[in-house]
């Protein structure tokens, strides 16, 4: 957190080494890691003030040594504080009521030190400073001493904002948390409450705030505005009315709206105009489209009149105009990025440039309805991570870093059945330029050949699966498959096919077998003369004109392989598998050789690039993904609209009477089946009673 906040502040401060870092860690290993990380990130050691100690027991900063801390203590205030203290930590509050950090607000309870950490940080904040602290939700509503502290913080206008975070965003705990933003001096008395609990994406077992979520939170904080189902600017009077309870759901309802269901549409069909009207934002953006899709069947209900909803939307004039307007708004954007990033590559400040480009994107999309600007920011941010890393290397190592290649190190197990791993080299990779990008631009033919081969390998694998699934149970029991019956055993397949081919005969095969029984040259030559129908020229002959045994056996096998077994026979399937295995084996060898050649050629290409080509590749790596990603945003709008309309159409497509007809039809079919059953009197009485429940009386009654 220290590194991130320092980097964010540095873009607004001219000069280097202008930021001092203060931190205190209770655990020694964390303390050591903190110092090491700060130094490794290039922060001047003179600007690092990190101590191993108990923050709640000993105020920090600043005293010279533990022995003379009372005599040498000097209050140090900072401009910004960020912290994530242990949640609801136990502590010793004894005699802490006289501690200057707590005496104006109160002392946190023994079992929960959350407010103790908060007050410690607030105490060290400059009058114009700002602090953020991550806390459990309980600090917002718990009573007792915590309520007293919370009330004082509110009455003194210290609380700027409260941000509810998604659950499970921190490793090791699923506790829902908040960020509380505080200032020592504020001119406003209201509190901005943000519910960002639904702003996340799944990342394994945890949830993760996306760049777009963080940006939306920050923008809302800066604007201090209420946003439906997301944020509310709450007055101090409202907080007083709620008895200083700051529990987020009291002020912000972020729950999803319940889906409406119209009883008339359920019974008679048709789509309520009220539900069509709920898509008003789309109808405003695409004039005339509603009338193109829907036709009224009464004053209050309509139906879909378009044969194909997706085509009707995509081909409508106002939709086409909308897409054209969007793309027009980004005219010259790629060139602008190139000027900012590529032309000034050694001096560009990635952090400040990102903000400028973000503002540019927002300005370009401001007048384009329905465009999610935060989705646009996410596209920029995801690609900017790569750009920032590359710029850091180029600016730190020099322009020649672009022409470097590095060993591609991967972690592998030493032995398959052991957990011990080792790092080994698997080929090479570009230091800056990805091999795949270079190959696509300069070695497209070679790359295409490899990709085609790999696609064929996938086809072969799918063909194995198809053949496996076609086998009967007794066929699977043979040795041609492995123990799990999910793959063929090459050796066994070949043996099976060889055995099956043994009985294959033809005049030429029989003649060749007879030829193999001959021992003397004159007999062999005579046999060749006497049997001209044999394709002797298809075999390589010895110097004396005879044909050797290997060549004859190969020809016999070739002729036998030409034999067609019945298509669905096991012999035909195994013959197909054997041929596929031979093709697969040969293809893997070819692909391996092609990859080795392509890698060597790629390395040579990167090392010998001219400056113009190098910069063009950077443009393709950095700028093209941003431009193409932003280009998809209007398509996302159209896709969302089509989905909404299709859902409406299917929602009321089946009426209650339709369901009843299907139900009666199914009941009739079932009753016919029941009537055909025979059994004991008790069974038949039971079935008769069952038919009553289905609305059908026993004919005997």
Residue ranges, per PLM feature:
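Hydrophobic beta-strand segment of the Class I
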Residues: 81-82, 131
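Flexible, glycine-/basic-rich loop-and-beta segments that form/coincide
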Residues: 171-268
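Terminal accessory regions of large proteins
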Residues: 284, 290-608, 612-700
């Amino acid at each position: 957190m220290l590194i991130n906040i320092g980097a964010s502040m540095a873009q607004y401060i001219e000069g280097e080494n202008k930021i001092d870092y203060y931190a205190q860690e209770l655990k020694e290993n964390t303390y050591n890691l903190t110092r090491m990380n700060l130094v490794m990130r290039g922060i001047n050691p003179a600007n690092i003030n990190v101590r191993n100690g108990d923050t709640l027991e000993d105020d920090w900063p600043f005293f010279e040594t533990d022995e003379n801390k009372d005599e040498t203590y000097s209050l140090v205030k900072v401009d910004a504080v960020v912290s994530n203290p242990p949640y609801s930590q136990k502590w010793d509050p004894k005699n802490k009521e006289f501690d200057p950090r707590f005496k104006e607000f109160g002392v946190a309870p023994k079992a929960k030190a959350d407010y103790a950490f908060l007050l410690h940080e607030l105490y060290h904040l400059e009058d114009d400073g700002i602090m953020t602290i991550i806390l459990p939700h309980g600090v917002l509503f718990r009573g007792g001493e915590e309520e007293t502290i919370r009330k004082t913080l509110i009455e003194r206008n210290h609380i700027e904002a409260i941000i509810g975070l998604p659950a499970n965003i921190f490793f090791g705990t699923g506790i829902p948390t908040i960020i509380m933003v505080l200032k020592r001096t504020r001119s406003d008395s209201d509190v901005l409450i943000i519910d960002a609990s639904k702003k996340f994406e799944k990342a394994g077992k945890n949830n993760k705030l996306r760049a777009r979520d963080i940006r939306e939170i920050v923008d809302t904080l800066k604007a201090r505005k209420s946003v439906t189902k997301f944020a509310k600017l709450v007055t101090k009077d409202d907080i007083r009315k709620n008895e200083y309870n700051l529990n987020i759901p009291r002020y912000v309802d972020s729950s999803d709206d319940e889906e409406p269901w119209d009883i008339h549409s359920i019974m008679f069909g048709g789509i309520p105009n009220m539900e069509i009207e709920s898509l008003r934002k789309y109808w405003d953006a695409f004039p005339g489209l509603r009338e193109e899709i829907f036709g009224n069947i009464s004053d209050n209900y309509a139906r879909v009149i378009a044969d194909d909803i997706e085509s009707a939307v995509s081909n409508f004039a106002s939709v086409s105009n909308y897409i054209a307007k969007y793309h027009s708004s980004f005219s010259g954007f790629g060139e602008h990025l190139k000027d900012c990033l590529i032309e000034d590559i050694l001096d560009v400040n990635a952090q400040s440039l990102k903000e400028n480009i973000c503002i540019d994107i927002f300005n370009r999309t401001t007048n384009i309805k329905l465009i999610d600007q935060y989705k646009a920011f996410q596209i920029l941010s995801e690609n900017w991570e790569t750009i920032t890393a590359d710029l850091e290397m180029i600016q730190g190592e020099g322009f020649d870093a672009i022409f470097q290649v590095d060993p591609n190190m991967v972690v592998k197990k030493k032995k398959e059945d052991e957990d011990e791993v080792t790092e080994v080299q698997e080929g090479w990779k570009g230091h800056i330029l990805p091999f795949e990008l270079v190959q696509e631009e300069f070695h497209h033919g070679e790359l295409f050949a490899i990709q085609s081969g790999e696609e064929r390998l996938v086809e072969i694998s799918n063909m194995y699966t198809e053949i496996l699934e076609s086998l009967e149970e007794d066929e699977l029991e043979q040795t041609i498959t492995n123990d799990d019956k999910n793959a063929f055993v090459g050796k066994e397949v070949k043996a099976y096919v060889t055995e099956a081919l043994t009985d294959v005969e033809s005049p030429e095969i029989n003649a060749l077998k007879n030829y193999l029984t001959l021992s003397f040259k004159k007999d062999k030559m005579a046999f060749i003369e006497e049997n001209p129908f044999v394709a002797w020229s298809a075999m390589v002959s010895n110097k004396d004109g005879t044909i050797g045994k290997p060549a004859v056996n190969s020809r016999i096998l070739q002729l036998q392989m030409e034999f067609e077994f019945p298509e669905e026979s096991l012999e035909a399937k195994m013959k197909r598998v054997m041929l596929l295995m031979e093709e697969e084996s040969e293809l893997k060898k070819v692909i391996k050789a092609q990859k080795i050649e392509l890698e060597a050629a790629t390395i040579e290409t990167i090392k010998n690039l001219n400056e113009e080509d190098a910069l063009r590749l950077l443009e393709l790596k950095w700028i093209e993904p941003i431009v193409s990603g932003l280009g998809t945003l209007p398509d996302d709008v159209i896709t969302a609209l089509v989905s909404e309309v299709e859902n409406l159409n299917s929602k009321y497509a089946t009426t209650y009477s339709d369901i009843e007809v299907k139900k009666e039809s199914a009941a009739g079919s079932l009753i016919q089946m029941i009537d055909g059953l025979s059994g004991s009197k008790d069974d038949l009485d039971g079935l008769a009673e069952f038919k009553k429940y289905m609305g059908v009386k026993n004919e005997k009654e």
